[in-house]
């Protein structure tokens, strides 16, 4: 069984809340701050933050104060490949990569929903993100059995 996450921006706390789909029935919601979009380097993972949550299929970095490596890596990679062709990047997001303005929560939410989650689900490009996590993330997954996919259809 693979983990499947949905995300919501909490504008009051300026954090990206992540939780497994169907967490309400299991009583296991969790949230964590997203951190910087353009930083591809994984940060240290807090040993106690979220340690009580054992969510199948999630890497340990899902509970990091900087957010999951999957989102950080994916965001950074997307920006790096499109920053020179900024017509493909929303204007506020392009400015954010240059440090010129603050991105609104609406634009950030649209970016994640449209660019990262919706397109990959509908177009069947989940393998790209799976490889990014398993190949690019230095953190071990919570579950040992393979395959453990971070964002995949169950």
Curated annotation (Swiss-Prot):
Species the sequence originates in: Hepatitis B virus genotype D (isolate Germany/1-91/1991)
InterPro entries reported in the protein's UniProt record: Transactivation_prot_X
Function: Multifunctional protein that plays a role in silencing host antiviral defenses and promoting viral transcription. Does not seem to be essential for HBV infection. May be directly involved in development of cirrhosis and liver cancer (hepatocellular carcinoma). Most of cytosolic activities involve modulation of cytosolic calcium. The effect on apoptosis is controversial depending on the cell types in which the studies have been conducted. May induce apoptosis by localizing in mitochondria and causing loss of mitochondrial membrane potential.
Similarity comment: family membership: Belongs to the orthohepadnavirus protein X family.
Post-translational modification: A fraction may be phosphorylated in insect cells and HepG2 cells, a human hepatoblastoma cell line. Phosphorylated in vitro by host protein kinase C or mitogen-activated protein kinase. N-acetylated in insect cells.
Entry keyword set: Activation of host NF-kappa-B by virus, Activator, Apoptosis, Host cytoplasm, Host G2/M cell cycle arrest by virus, Host mitochondrion, Host nucleus, Host-virus interaction, Modulation of host cell cycle by virus, Transcription, Transcription regulation
Location of this chain's protein in the cell: Host cytoplasm; Host nucleus; Host mitochondrion
Ranges where the record places region Mitochondrial targeting sequence: 68-117
GO biological process: DNA-templated transcription; symbiont-mediated activation of host NF-kappaB cascade; symbiont-mediated arrest of host cell cycle during G2/M transition; viral genome replication
Keyword Transcription part of the UniProt annotation: yes
GO terms for cellular component: host cell mitochondrion; host cell nucleus
Protein name: Protein X
């Amino acid at each position: 069984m693979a983990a499947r996450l949905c995300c919501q921006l909490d504008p009051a706390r300026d954090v990206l809340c992540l939780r497994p789909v169907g967490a309400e029935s299991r009583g296991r919601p969790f949230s964590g701050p997203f951190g910087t979009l353009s930083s591809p380097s994984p940060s240290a993972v807090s040993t106690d933050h979220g340690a009580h949550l054992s969510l199948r299929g999630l890497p340990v970095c899902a509970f990091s104060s900087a957010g999951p490596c999957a989102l950080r890596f994916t965001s950074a990679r997307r920006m790096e490949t499109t920053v020179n062709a900024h017509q493909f990047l929303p204007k506020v997001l392009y400015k954010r990569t240059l440090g010129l303005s603050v991105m609104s929560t609406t634009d950030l939410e649209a970016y994640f929903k449209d660019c990262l989650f919706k397109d990959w689900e509908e177009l069947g490009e989940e393998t790209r993100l799976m490889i990014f996590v398993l190949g690019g993330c230095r953190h071990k997954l919570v579950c040992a059995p393979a395959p453990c996919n971070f964002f995949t259809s169950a």
